[in-house]
Amino acid sequence: MSLNLPGYALFFILLVASSGAKPAPDLQILEPPLSSLEEQEEMQEEVQEKVQEQQEEVQEKVQEQQEEVQEQQEEVQEQQEEQQEEVQERGRGTGDVLLRAQLDSSTWALQKDDVLMRLFKDLLRTSKRSRSRYKKGGLRSCFGVRLARIGSFSGLGC
């Protein structure tokens, strides 16, 4: 390995020139690090003041939101009370509560009768052909009556 110093120098110069890096013209522009305790204490006080201001702002926002929520809850309660009063007035004026209980029991008996009637009508509507498919607990097999023998012989029966 031979050292090619002029080649490396030329590469470095081209690299710096292409990147556009320039040395700082005035080193006094850069601020020196905080060296005194007084400056550090001043910075801490400023930070604490900003934190307190932000906390106060957050507390104010929280209080405003709580007040809004309370107002909304009160409105909802008022609406519920109004609705309950309306329902009570309707129920008291006509005596519907007793009639509803009586109708519910009688409609239940009518519903039972309707269900049985529908079942019998459905059974009467079915054709004899479809009724013959069902024997002692349903279809003979998943293939039907004619294909039951073929399915059982082939091993494909259900």
From Swiss-Prot:
Main subcellular localisation: secreted
Q: Which UniProt keywords apply?
A: Cleavage on pair of basic residues, Disulfide bond, Hormone, Secreted, Signal, Vasoactive
| Signal peptide positions on this chain | 1-21
Identify the PROSITE patterns for this entry: NATRIURETIC_PEPTIDE
Disulphide bridges in this chain?
Answer: 142-158
| Gene Ontology process terms (BP) | blood vessel diameter maintenance; cGMP biosynthetic process; receptor guanylyl cyclase signaling pathway
Q: Which organism is it from?
A: Takifugu rubripes
Name listed for the protein in its UniProt record = C-type natriuretic peptide 3
**Disordered: annotated segments:** 32-95
Which residues get removed as pro-piece? 22-136
Source domain of life is Eukaryota
GO terms for molecular function, please? hormone activity
List compositional bias (Basic and acidic residues) regions by residue number.
Answer: 47-64
